[in-house]
């Protein structure tokens, strides 16, 4: 470790010549190039989130060291071992339906992008994340026609703000059976186990066979004893109600069993029930833990792409599924004759005011896999508003991921721990309370609301990889734990991103960017500065006769050492600024409150909005480790 240095470099101002400014302004909706994003690093963090959500006895080799063992007696009082699985979000309930959906999506990512995960040295970690869920499902499936689908109660759990390691709330377990059916959750669990069986098959054949056995039994249970799970399980209705019913899950489970086994009986099932169950009738603009139709339609389109004429007996029905899949994709791409997914002004798909990012991640996944299906078959997507090539579909999916990672009007990453500017007040109990290893005293149920939930301090534990609910319909985001609709991450929101990150990391940039990149301002000579600045104007608009510009400045640490203290002078700034903290001294700024160092090669992102010319930025003092 180098000795600490305190340097005052020659002052370096960042200036943009008038001609360059004009060029920048002409590049409407300009942005940094896609290659600026580290998709492999984002993939790594995404997997850390699943570690942070683990319930039960944690392994010694875990990477999330602030988490400890928890809920080690789940189910015991009711005569069943339900230790393990995942906590759903910022609370400590184990909801079976969204957990199973998350495992399905993790597994689908492996099915489609196994090679990319192997090449990126991530496959073993994804399989570990899947196995943590499937081991729990196998334990929860205690009889052919019985499945334990929830541990904990949302109402009582939400009355306390405490760490998982200190839980004092009831851990009541709930099951479905022939008298209390739940076809949605039984079907989704069957789908998860079938998808996981295919993912594990090349690496652990015995385990794959075990998962398939349970999947087949659960599908038969779901189909034979049909009924809405939230009619049988009132405690789930308030938190994860089934709006789409159970028929989509029955088709979804059968489709995954066909994908995993090739057994024609499952293809026959989705064909014979296509119309009655809505598979070829529902044209949707969302894909989620509740509504599986778009995912089902894309998955069955794959059969056509792979088998073509050999699926002759089912081709007509499969083409109807494909038509509905392409309705969804065209709606995402804004080429569906007005029947499109809504977009925010900053370019993010917007489906719901509550946890919208879960719809962004699932849509990005379907767009990504379908783009590859088309590319492999040398096909194109024919939308009402024009033909779309596979590369364009992938480009749009990338634009959504890039928005998540920071290419948005706030310049903020909505994935916690990615980049230098991300949410630091996440609606998550474990992240907001000091770790049991840092503060061994038990944290009380109620008093913790005042001390931690309502605290303005940043989270003491960084919940790396957590995809928060995201901004509102106007791209605004309030970094506040109380803002649970937007600040809470979920298993369902994170899971689809695993496969998307794997795919994008394998081809981080393409030759035809979605937007025309703004020319970078000439980089000034470092002149002793530890930072290399690149300035881009990413948006411009007129209000009350004044032209306003959104400026993004990336400051890369090029000094070869981690910077532990930084003082910047920012002159001629008239608007709001994000990514640095104002000091008491005039025009002086330092690291934001959530940041203590800038590693060698890392970037600090500064965003500001103002009318008139750009601000002038200079490094006036810094220290390195």
Swiss-Prot record:
Signal sequence segment: 1-34
Broad class of enzyme this protein falls into: hydrolase
Glycosylation sites: 440
UniProt-listed PROSITE patterns: GH9_1, GH9_2, GH9_3
Spans annotated as Disordered: 509-530
Pfam families according to UniProt: CBM49 (PF09478), Glyco_hydro_9 (PF00759)
Keywords: Carbohydrate metabolism, Cellulose degradation, Glycoprotein, Glycosidase, Hydrolase, Polysaccharide degradation, Secreted, Signal
InterPro entries: 6-hairpin_glycosidase_sf, 6hp_glycosidase-like_sf, CBM_49, Glyco_hydro_9, Glyco_hydro_9_Asp/Glu_AS, Glyco_hydro_9_His_AS
Catalytic reactions on record: Endohydrolysis of (1->4)-beta-D-glucosidic linkages in cellulose, lichenin and cereal beta-D-glucans
GO cellular component annotations of the record: extracellular region
EC number of this enzyme: 3.2.1.4
Main location: secreted
Protein localization: Secreted
Active-site residues, as the UniProt record annotates them: 91, 427, 479, 488
GO molecular function: carbohydrate binding; cellulase activity
SMART domains reported in the protein's UniProt record: CBM49
Superkingdom classification of source: Eukaryota
Keyword Protease on entry: no
Organs and tissues of expression: Expressed in roots and flowers.
Record-stated family: Belongs to the glycosyl hydrolase 9 (cellulase E) family.
UniProt name for this protein: Endoglucanase 13
Organism: Oryza sativa subsp. japonica
Gene name tied to this protein: GLU6
């Amino acid at each position: 470790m180098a000795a600490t240095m305190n340097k005052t470099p020659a002052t370096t101002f960042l200036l943009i010549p008038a001609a360059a400014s004009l060029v920048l302004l002409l590049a409407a909706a300009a942005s940094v190039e896609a290659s600026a994003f580290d998709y492999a690093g984002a993939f790594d963090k995404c997997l850390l989130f699943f570690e942070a959500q683990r319930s039960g006895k944690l392994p010694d080799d875990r990477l999330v060291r602030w988490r400890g063992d928890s809920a080690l007696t789940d189910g015991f009082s009711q005569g069943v071992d339900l230790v393990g699985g995942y906590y759903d979000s910022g609370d400590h309930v184990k909801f079976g339906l969204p957990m199973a959906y998350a495992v399905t999506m993790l597994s689908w990512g492996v099915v489609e992008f196994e090679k990319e995960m192997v090449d990126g040295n991530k496959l073993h970690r994804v399989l570990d994340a899947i196995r943590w869920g499937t081991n729990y499902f196998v334990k929860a499936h205690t009889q052919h026609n019985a499945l334990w689908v929830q541990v904990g109660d949302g109402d009582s759990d939400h009355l306390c703000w405490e760490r998982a390691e200190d839980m004092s709330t009831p851990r009541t377990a709930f099951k479905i059976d022939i008298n209390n059916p739940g076809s949605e959750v039984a079907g989704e669990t069957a789908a998860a186990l079938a998808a996981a069986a295919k993912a594990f098959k090349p690496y652990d054949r015995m385990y794959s066979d075990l998962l398939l056995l349970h999947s087949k039994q659960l599908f038969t249970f779901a189909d034979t004893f049909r009924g809405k799970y939230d009619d049988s399980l009132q405690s789930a209705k308030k938190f994860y109600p089934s709006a789409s019913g159970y028929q989509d899950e029955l088709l979804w489970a059968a489709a995954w069993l066909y994908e995993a086994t090739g057994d024609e009986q499952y293809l026959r099932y989705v064909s014979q029930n296509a119309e009655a169950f809505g598979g070829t009738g529902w044209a949707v603009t969302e894909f989620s833990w509740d509504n599986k139709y778009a995912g089902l339609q894309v998955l069955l389109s794959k059969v056509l792409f792979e088998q073509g004429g050999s699926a002759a007996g089912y081709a007509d029905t499969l083409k109807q599924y494909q038509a509905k899949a392409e309705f969804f994709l065209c709606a995402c791409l804004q080429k569906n004759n007005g029947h499109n997914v809504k977009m925010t002004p900053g370019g993010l798909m917007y489906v719901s005011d509550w946890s919208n990012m879960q719809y962004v991640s699932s849509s990005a996944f379907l767009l990504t896999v379908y783009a590859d299906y088309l590319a492999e078959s040398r096909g194109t997507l024919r939308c009402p508003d024009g033909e779309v090539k596979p590369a364009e579909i992938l480009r749009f999916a990338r634009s959504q991921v890039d928005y998540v990672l920071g290419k948005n009007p706030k310049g903020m990453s909505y994935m916690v721990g990615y980049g230098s500017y991300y949410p630091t007040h996440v609606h998550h109990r474990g992240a907001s309370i000091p770790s049991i290893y840092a503060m061994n005293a038990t944290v009380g149920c109620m008093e913790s609301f005042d001390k931690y939930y309502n605290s303005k301090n940043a989270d003491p534990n960084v919940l790396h990889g957590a995809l928060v609910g995201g901004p509102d319909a106007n791209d605004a985001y309030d970094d506040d734990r109380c803002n649970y609709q937007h600040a809470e991450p979920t298993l369902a929101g994170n899971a689809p991103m695993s496969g998307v990150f794997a795919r994008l990391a394998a081809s981080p940039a393409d030759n035809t960017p979605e937007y025309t990149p703004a020319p970078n301002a000439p980089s000034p000579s470092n002149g002793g500065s530890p930072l290399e600045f690149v300035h881009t104007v990413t948006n411009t608009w007129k209000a009350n006769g004044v032209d306003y510009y959104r400026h993004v400045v990336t400051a890369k640490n090029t000094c070869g050492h981690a910077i532990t203290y930084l003082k910047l002078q920012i002159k001629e700034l008239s608007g709001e600024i994000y990514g640095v903290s104002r000091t008491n001294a005039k025009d002086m700024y330092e690291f934001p409150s959530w940041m203590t160092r800038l590693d060698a090669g890392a970037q600090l992102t500064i965003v500001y909005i103002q009318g008139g010319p750009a601000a002038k930025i200079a490094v006036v003092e810094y220290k390195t480790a």
